[in-house]
Swiss-Prot record:
GO terms for biological process, alphabetical: translation
Superkingdom classification of source: Eukaryota
Gene3D superfamilies, A to Z: 2.20.25.30
Name of the protein described by the UniProt record: Large ribosomal subunit protein eL43z
Amino acid sequence: MTKRTKKARIVGKYGTRYGASLRKQIKKMEVSQHNKYFCEFCGKYSVKRKVVGIWGCKDCGKVKAGGAYTMNTASAVTVRSTIRRLREQTES
């Protein structure tokens, strides 16, 4: 194991290689991909990444397709809000 500092955290494994700005970008991605996310089906924070783009809930067992590093991509959030807005317009 290499020696890690508190500041580097998850990207401490890269040491001084690849440059500071690239390590900052990688840190953002790796932190988000290892986070636990909220499950819409069972209501718990137990969704973790299985492989690239596939997210699974440990409690209820539901599997959902999402982004590579985050469960919801920016375009998916936009589409969801647009669908919700159109649905509200047709109901009223």
